[in-house]
């Protein structure tokens, strides 16, 4: 089905992580008139965190959620990280025009988030992916790692290119 035809419910929930739940992977949703639930766990007044989480989780929806090959799930997680970075950056354009009081806080959030991961050049990112491939393939969501540094490092690198040519976002619809 086309993305515009999808019913998406966005809800706040009280857990330690946000999540996207597609109908195709959840039997309890079979009789519900919704295709995806997106659960966010940030506070209502934490705009930057809401933007970050929503961009990440909505990217899973755009990609049809998770790839069939579990070993490739790290790619979708890194693309979602890129989307979060991209949306945080363009949110400042919106805030400057409509809610200037949020610009400084959003920029501070973005800088703080980006500082938690490495900044690598082309050869550096290739070496990084090669050196971490085993971990990327077996633990794409970095479940036992605080802050998801592998996904953040790769997503941050990819975001630089997507920010230059936003047409690149069209490609993520084909990753499933």
Language-model features and meaning:
Residues 5, 63, 84-93, 163:
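Sec-exported extracytoplasmic/periplasmic mature domains
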Residues 120-176:
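Pan-zinc metallopeptidase signature
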């Amino acid at each position: 089905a086309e993305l515009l035809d999808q019913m998406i419910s966005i809800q706040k929930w009280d857990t330690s992580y946000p999540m996207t739940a597609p109908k195709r992977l959840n039997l309890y949703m079979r009789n519900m008139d919704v295709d995806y639930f997106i659960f966010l766990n940030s506070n209502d007044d934490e705009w930057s965190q809401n933007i970050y989480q929503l961009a990440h989780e909505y990217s899973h929806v755009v990609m049809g959620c998770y790839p069939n090959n579990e070993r490739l799930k790290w790619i979708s997680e890194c693309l979602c990280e890129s989307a979060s970075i991209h949306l945080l950056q363009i949110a400042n354009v919106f805030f400057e025009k409509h809610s200037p009081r949020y610009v400084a806080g959003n920029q501070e959030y973005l800088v703080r988030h980006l500082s938690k991961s490495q900044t690598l050049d082309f050869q550096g990112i290739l070496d990084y992916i090669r050196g971490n491939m085993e971990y990327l393939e077996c633990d794409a969501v970095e479940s036992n790692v605080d802050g998801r540094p592998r996904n953040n490092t790769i997503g941050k690198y990819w975001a630089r290119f997507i920010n230059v040519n936003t047409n690149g976002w069209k490609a993520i619809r084909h990753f499933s």
